[in-house]
Structure formats: C-alpha cells, structure tokens
From Swiss-Prot:
Its main location: cytoplasm. Residues 105-182 are annotated as: Disordered. NCBIfam families: PRK04950.1 (NF003434). GO terms for cellular component: cytosol. Gene3D superfamilies: ProQ/FinO domain. It comes from Escherichia coli O139:H28 (strain E24377A / ETEC). This is RNA chaperone ProQ. Coiled coil: none annotated. It is found in: Cytoplasm.
Length: 232
C-alpha cells in the first residue's frame, strides 16, 4: 500500500472533507447543519484515508462547527444532513438559540480584540511623540500688483542719478629747503640744490671760491653760484 499524504492542519482536513463529501461539508459560503453523531460516521467512512486520526477529525469538526458561516446556517427551519446530504431532521429551538449565543460571543471577542489593538496603537503613537495633525495655518494673501493691460505702453523705470564724489585736487607739495648761510662750511663733493626761480636743481660742490661756490649740475654743466642761490 502506497504512503498517502498527511494532512497537517484542521483547515486542510476541512478542505478534504468538503471534497470527499460535497453534499455535507463546504469549503466556503454558508454551511449546512450537520447530523447529530456525524463524528462516528466520519470515523467509519474515512478510516485509513489520508492517514487521518480521530483527534484530527474531532479538531476539524470543532473548528468547522464553531465558524461564523456554520453558526449563521443554524437557524429556525434549517434541516440537518448526513455525509451524503440526506436530511436528518429539523433543528430544534434549543440548538438554534445556542448557535445564536455562540455567534454573538464570537463577534464580541473579535470586537474586543480590535479595540485592544487600537488602544495599543494609540499608546505606541503617544509614546513615540506623534501628535494629531494640527489644522493648517491660514496664509495671508500676498498683495497683488495691478497687471499691465495688454497693449499698454510700459513705463521706463526712473533711474536714480548716480552721485559722483567730487574729486579732490591735491595741491602740489612744496618742498622745504634750508638756505646755505655759510659757504665756508661746505665741502667738496657735498650734495645740495641750486635755486632757479620756483625750482631747485640737484648739484654737487666742486670748489669754494671767493666769488661763490662752483657746482656741477646733474646735466654735467658747471657754474659758480652765489650763496643766496644755494639750499639744502
């Protein structure tokens, strides 16, 4: 006998039962109420198939009959079915009421879980310093300048006259000279200046005579100059 694949979860077992007994079990949509004692029928019919154990079958049945879609199907006037889909009696009021309470409790548990999750999210957001978005600040409209009409001449911008700083004319610096008062104090080779009007020319003493001082200008010309025309 070949090894058969093993079903690992109750959902896989329910999918197998829906395929094996399609008139009794369903994988989706509203489920039909099951026959009382259907567990033993399953043990007898699927013994050895898919390596299913009684524990797996019992867990799968518990999950199937506690699902919302099964509890929705347990309502007044509904009929129980066996593995082949044959009717096995109408639901009594006690079973309908029990299913209604189970459904309400299941919904309440889900709502409580959602509320708890929302509270945890809010606490986490508060701990992280996240604040609700503040209302946007109203922006003041920027003053609009009147737009130039199409075809209107554009006025040239008035240019500000650039004020030029008045130029200061520097007066020529007048050289200060010291007149030679005693020619006997002069020495040959000494540098001095010879006054000629408003100017003074550089010169060198060549000889001191009784008539004055013989000097040589930078131009190479030599001449005798009296003391009143000599300055330092």
């Amino acid at each position: 006998m070949e090894n058969q694949p093993k079903l690992n979860s109750s959902k896989e077992v329910i999918a197998f039962l829906a395929e094996r007994f399609p008139h009794c079990f369903s994988a989706e949509g509203e489920a039909r109420p099951l026959k009382i004692g259907i567990f033993q029928d399953l043990v007898d019919r699927v013994a050895g198939e898919m390596n299913l154990s009684k524990t797996q079958l019992r867990s799968a049945l518990r999950l199937y009959t506690s699902s919302w879609r099964y509890l929705y199907g347990v309502k007044p006037g509904a009929t129980r079915v066996d593995l082949d889909g044959n009717p096995c009696g109408e639901l009594d009021e006690q079973h309908v009421e029990h299913a209604r309470k189970q459904l309400e409790e299941a919904k309440a548990r889900v709502q409580a879980q959602r509320a708890e999750q929302q509270a945890k999210k809010r606490e986490a957001a508060a701990a992280a310093g996240e604040k609700e978005d503040a209302p946007p600040r109203e922006r003041k409209p920027r003053p609009t300048t009147p737009r130039r009409k199409e075809g209107a001449e554009r006025k040239p911008r008035a240019q500000k006259p650039v004020e030029k700083a008045p130029k200061t004319v520097k007066a020529p610096r007048e050289e200060q000279h010291t007149p030679v008062s005693d020619i006997s104090a002069l020495t040959v080779g000494q540098a001095l200046k010879v006054k000629a009007g408003q100017n003074a020319m550089d010169a060198t003493v060549l000889e001191i005579t009784k008539d004055g001082v013989r000097v040589q200008l930078n131009s190479g010309m030599s001449l005798i100059v009296r003391a009143e025309h000599l300055v330092f």
